[in-house]
């Protein structure tokens, strides 16, 4: 008699993906972030669904409906804090997941890597629209400034912005359509994540050594299911500590003031997870140039498979490339800090140097380091 998980059409799919899946025997904790991102997505969809039951996407009542959720709905304050901090946690896991992919050379799986970049863009779009819903000062002005960047596109820019706004400024129509998109996008992300997994299971997982592991594989269950479960427990412990003790740590206190189109905040900035890209945007004095640099700051990830010059896949035994990668991480942290500062000296020049260094490391220094390391191995 065949085991049900190997014969039932639905169970068979789950079995191939999560139970009998052959996995490298040496993958470390850095490979946990895929499952943690899945957990974050589930938290966001469930908490978002409950928030949508009480939220009204209308400029007159949006702010008071969020207040109503926090004050009158049973555990509404908890659901709202979970959703707001869940977004931050999502991006923390996402950036660590991308960092691991760069460090261990996982970008050589082209389809998996490119579907991951599409997932990143979708998640960023969802996060941006979610920021608008409380209809606080930073919601309104952040939406105005960021959407207005599209007006830099030649010829169609102004029409495009007015089409997105649904009028001549960010208003009720904008909030309504953002709510519709924000509701549907997580389900598109979930579908895209399944495509991402499909591509990954075509090739199998990479490992810290960056070498083929076909000769030494173990079943995913129970080894990596247990490992993933431990990661989830640790993640949830960190998450609920943040939600219950310091829910506004990563938020913007300006958003506790209702949106006022007549009063511009002294410093308009997006959420912390977009600050590095925002700093790159601001470092270029030209509007169109800034928008191009903003898009390229994420799209440059797609070039990694094409600018790989080293014979070794992983950075584990490549000290020069390791140094450059950690230099890039430091640079992104500096850009994140700069993005949250006002546009005045010395922040302007620091942002410009950090932006130049970001592209220089990825496009020039890392490929050169790879070629040098090839020569060093031959010695």
UniProtKB/Swiss-Prot annotation:
CC cofactor note: Binds 2 heme b groups non-covalently.
This protein's GO CC annotations: mitochondrial inner membrane; respiratory chain complex III
Any single GO BP term: mitochondrial electron transport, ubiquinol to cytochrome c
Gene3D superfamilies reported for this sequence: Cytochrome Bc1 Complex, Chain C
A single GO molecular function term of this UniProt record: ubiquinol-cytochrome-c reductase activity
Location in the cell: Mitochondrion inner membrane
UniProt binding sites for heme b b566: 97, 196
InterPro entries: Cyt_b/b6_C (IPR005798), Cyt_b/b6_C_sf (IPR036150), Cyt_b/b6_N (IPR005797), Cytb/b6-like_sf (IPR027387), Cytochrome_b (IPR030689), Cytochrome_b_C_euk/bac (IPR048260), Cytochrome_b_N_euk/bac (IPR048259), Di-haem_cyt_TM (IPR016174)
Disulfide bonds: none
Transmembrane stretches, start-end: 33-53, 77-98, 113-133, 178-198, 226-246, 288-308, 320-340, 347-367
A Pfam cross-reference name: Cytochrome_B
Residues involved in heme b b562 binding: 83, 182
Cofactor: heme b
UniProt keyword terms in alphabetical order: Electron transport, Heme, Iron, Membrane, Metal-binding, Mitochondrion, Mitochondrion inner membrane, Respiratory chain, Transmembrane, Transmembrane helix, Transport, Ubiquinone
Binding site for a ubiquinone: 201
Major localization listed first in the record, in broad terms: mitochondrion
Membrane topology label: Multi-pass membrane protein
Biological role: Component of the ubiquinol-cytochrome c reductase complex (complex III or cytochrome b-c1 complex) that is part of the mitochondrial respiratory chain. The b-c1 complex mediates electron transfer from ubiquinol to cytochrome c. Contributes to the generation of a proton gradient across the mitochondrial membrane that is then used for ATP synthesis.
Assembly notes: The cytochrome bc1 complex contains 11 subunits: 3 respiratory subunits (MT-CYB, CYC1 and UQCRFS1), 2 core proteins (UQCRC1 and UQCRC2) and 6 low-molecular weight proteins (UQCRH/QCR6, UQCRB/QCR7, UQCRQ/QCR8, UQCR10/QCR9, UQCR11/QCR10 and a cleavage product of UQCRFS1). This cytochrome bc1 complex then forms a dimer.
Note: Heme 1 (or BL or b562) is low-potential and absorbs at about 562 nm, and heme 2 (or BH or b566) is high-potential and absorbs at about 566 nm.
Similarity field: Belongs to the cytochrome b family.
Protein name stated in the entry: Cytochrome b
Species lineage: Eukaryota, Metazoa, Chordata, Craniata, Vertebrata
Gene name for this UniProt entry: MT-CYB
């Amino acid at each position: 008699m065949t085991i049900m998980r190997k014969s039932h059409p639905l169970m068979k799919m789950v079995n191939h993906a999560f139970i009998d899946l052959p996995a490298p025997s040496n993958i470390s904790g850095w490979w946990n972030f895929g499952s943690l991102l899945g957990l974050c997505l589930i938290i966001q969809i469930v908490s978002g669904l409950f928030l949508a039951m009480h939220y009204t996407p209308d400029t007159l009542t949006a702010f008071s409906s969020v207040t109503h959720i926090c004050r009158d709905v049973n555990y509404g304050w908890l659901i709202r804090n979970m959703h707001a901090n869940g977004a931050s946690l999502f991006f923390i896991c996402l950036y660590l997941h991308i960092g691991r992919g760069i460090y261990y050379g996982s970008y050589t799986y082209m389809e998996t890597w490119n579907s991951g970049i599409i997932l990143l863009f979708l998640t960023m779009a969802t996060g941006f629209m979610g920021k608008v819903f409380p209809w606080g000062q930073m919601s309104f002005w952040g939406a105005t400034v960021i959407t207005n960047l599209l007006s830099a596109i030649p010829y169609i820019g102004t029409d495009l912005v007015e089409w997105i706004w649904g009028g001549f400024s960010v208003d009720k129509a904008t909030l309504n359509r953002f709510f519709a998109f924000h509701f549907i996008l997580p389900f598109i992300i979930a579908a895209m994540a399944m495509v991402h997994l499909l591509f990954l299971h075509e090739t199998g997982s990479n490992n810290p050594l960056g070498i083929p592991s076909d000769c030494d594989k173990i079943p995913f269950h129970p080894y990596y299911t247990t490992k993933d479960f431990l990661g989830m427990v640790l993640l949830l412990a960190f998450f609920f500590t943040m939600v219950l003790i310091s829910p506004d740590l990563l938020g913007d206190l300006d958003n506790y003031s209702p949106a006022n189109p007549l009063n511009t905040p002294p410093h308009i900035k997006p959420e912390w997870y977009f600050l590095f890209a925002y700093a790159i945007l601001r470092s270029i004095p030209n509007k169109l140039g800034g928008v191009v640099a903003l898009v390229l700051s994420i799209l440059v990830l797609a070039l990694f498979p094409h600018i790989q010059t080293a014979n070794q896949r992983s950075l584990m035994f490549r000290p020069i490339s390791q140094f450059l990668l950690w230099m890039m991480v430091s640079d992104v942290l500096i850009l994140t800090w700069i993005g949250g500062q006002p546009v005045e000296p010395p922040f302007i020049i620091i942002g410009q140097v950090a932006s130049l260094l970001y592209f220089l490391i990825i496009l020039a220094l890392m490929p050169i380091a790879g070629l040098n390391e090839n020569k060093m191995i031959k010695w």
